[in-house]
Design a protein with these regions (language model features):
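Conserved P-loop
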Residues: 1-58, 62-65, 69-70, 74
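Conserved GTP-binding G-domain of TRAFAC-class P-loop NTPases and closely related GTPase folds
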Residues: 122-204
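Short, well-ordered beta-strand core segments
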Residues: 25-26, 112, 149-151
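Structured loop/turn residues at beta-strand edges in well-structured enzyme cores
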Residues: 58, 108, 144
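P-loop NTPase motor core
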Residues: 67-141
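Conserved nucleotide-binding/hydrolysis micro-motifs of P-loop NTPases
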Residues: 31-34, 68-70, 118-122, 155-156, ...
Length: 204
């Protein structure tokens, strides 16, 4: 089974910047430039079928979907004229099925990082992935589908806290680490004794 990792953060917090040192494939849901000089080969699509095909066919052991939240937004906007609540169930189901595909159909050495904006409740301070509102949140708890959720704050990752960040016990030495997905990738592979990206890790 593959491993999905959720990376949350506000715009400008360093989510996309964390990709810089990682040898990976990148799927852009919307076309925007990365915030650093790079030679990454990227594919831009919000089509779930194409994304699944790319995940299956990619030779990279680590793949980033940036920004995964726009999968929901894009489908919602394309279907904005549809009436009724069924479309929210379908939106939730499509996103849920993508995560299920990663965890059940991809090889174990594949790690897929889904970058999303965060939404913080002004009253409770609770942080969750930014979706398209309560009608979708009632259908699926996005963060509940992930064992590893990293929160990006001021160009650092929170790995465990009382909020949304979580990771398996002793995967990371501290609750706060640098926002470098190459470091995260190595920690995950070491923790689960995974193959993949070994030569790239040694070269960096």
């Amino acid at each position: 089974m593959g491993i999905p990792v959720l990376v949350l953060g506000r715009s400008g917090s360093g989510k996309s910047r964390s990709i810089k040192n990682l040898d990976c494939g990148i799927i852009k849901v919307i076309e925007k430039e990365l915030p650093f000089k790079n030679n990454f080969k990227t594919v831009t699509t919000s089509d779930y079928v194409k994304i699944i095909q790319i995940l299956m066919g990619s030779k990279k052991d680590s793949i980033v979907i940036d920004d995964a939240g726009y999968l929901l937004t894009d489908e919602f906007m394309r279907r904005a004229t549809e009436k009724g609540y069924d479309k929210f169930t379908e939106l939730a189901n499509n996103f849920y099925n993508l995560i299920q595909f990663i965890t059940t159909k991809l090889p174990r050495e594949k790690i897929v990082y889904l970058l999303m904006h965060e939404d913080e409740n002004e009253i409770t301070g609770q942080v969750k992935p930014k979706t398209i509102g309560k009608l979708l949140d009632e259908k699926v708890c996005v963060e509940g589908m992930f064992t590893i959720v990293l929160r990006c704050i001021e160009h650092k990752f929170l790995t465990n806290n009382s909020g949304c960040a979580k990771s398996p016990e002793e995967m990371f030495e501290t609750e706060e680490i640098e926002n470098d997905l190459n470091v995260v990738d190595k920690a995950i592979r070491d923790y689960y004794n995974l193959g993949g990206n070994e030569n790239d890790q040694q070269a960096k």
